[in-house]
Regions:
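Internal, well-folded beta-alpha domain core
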Residues: 59-214
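Primarily extracytoplasmic ectodomains and periplasmic/lumenal surface modules that are beta-strand-rich
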Residues: 13-14, 45-49, 108-109
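Residue-level detector of functional hotspots within protein domains
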Residues: 1, 13, 40, 85-89
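Extracellular structured ligand-interaction cores
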Residues: 3, 49-51, 96-98
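Flexible, active-site-adjacent loop/turn segments at secondary-structure boundaries
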Residues: 13, 25-27, 92
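N-terminal, Lys/Arg- and Ser/Thr-rich interaction peptides
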Residues: 1-20
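Beta-strand secondary-structure signal
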Residues: 5-7, 53, 100-102
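Glycine/small-residue-rich interface belts in oligomeric ring/scaffold proteins
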Residues: 19-80
Length: 214
């Protein structure tokens, strides 16, 4: 079956791992929620009932040092004095990343917001191509899979992140997945002759492993 192939590139990417504000490490492979967010940005927030998979490559990892400010006294109008507290944060970035997304979405491209890879300073560009994917067992590399596939480390990651306007903060849909350096996939990218883990997005927070015929 022919899938849309989206090749996103940037000079750097940051997919925050954990909640430590001072040491902000990055996932080496973005969580599923990142890819869902990118697809909804490109094809529209209301898309559902589609299949997708993705891979991630990068050249190196770099840790930057930033000064962060927190407003602690709203009664002071001056930028000086005790209005702000500041500290340093160590932020980890993937250097020259390439994220390749495959999807069967067949709707017009919208691109509702600026494309970035995890942070607003990681601006990205996207190239659109095609790729055939078939139901054939093949070895896949460096991908998140269901926890019952492969031998990689199991972690809890976000499946989807939705901003809740009524609450004023984000709702997180999470689950346990396994990050495998190498695994046996049910589907194969015909051009690359490599395995790809496919997922089926049914609706908000409802994402399942897809292993059927295409």
């Amino acid at each position: 079956m022919e899938f849309n192939k989206l090749i996103l590139t940037s000079t750097m990417a940051h997919f925050k791992s954990g909640i430590n504000g001072k040491n902000q490490n990055t996932f080496r492979v973005p969580p599923i929620s990142t890819i869902v967010g990118i697809l909804k940005n490109i094809y529209g927030k209301e898309v559902k009932n589609f299949i997708f998979g993705y891979t991630c490559q990068y050249e190196d990892v770099f840790k930057d040092v930033n000064t962060i400010y927190k407003e602690v006294n709203l009664n002071i109008t001056s930028a000086k004095g005790d209005r702000f507290q500041h500290d340093i944060a160590f932020i980890e970035y993937l250097i020259n990343p390439t994220i390749t997304i495959y999807t069967n979405l067949d709707v017009p491209i919208q691109i509702n917001d600026i494309l970035n890879l995890g942070k607003t300073n990681c601006l990205a560009k996207c190239k659109f191509e095609k790729e055939n994917i078939t139901l054939k067992e093949c070895t896949g590399y460096n991908q998140w899979t269901p926890k019952n596939i492969g031998n990689g480390e199991i972690k809890r990651i976000n499946k989807e992140t939705i901003y809740n306007k009524n609450k004023g903060y984000y709702d997180y849909y999470t689950d346990l997945f396994r990050l495998n350096e190498e695994f046996m996939a049910k589907h194969m990218l015909e051009d690359a002759e490599e395995g790809i883990q496919l997922w089926q997005y049914k609706g908000v927070g409802d994402i399942e492993c897809y292993q059927d015929n295409l």
